Amino acid sequence: MEENISDLVKKGNQLIIDGDFEKALSYFEQAVIMQPNNPDILNKKGVALRGLGRYDEAIECFNKSLQLDPRDLDSS
């Protein structure tokens, strides 16, 4: 199960680099279903949402990530 999540996140990260935020979001959404309280995955989902201009949803993801891990300075 962890490998599957790792693969989803790796694919999502590459898609963000490639600028395909819509497809990246689908990978991060799958990963969030598997680990809903993982602040790193929530942050990545927020990055994809921000790239799509869905700012309110992105802020929700960033805020939840910070609630789960207040030391996470990458949540932006």
Located regions from the model:
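Conserved structural position within tetratricopeptide repeats
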Residues: 30-33, 63-67
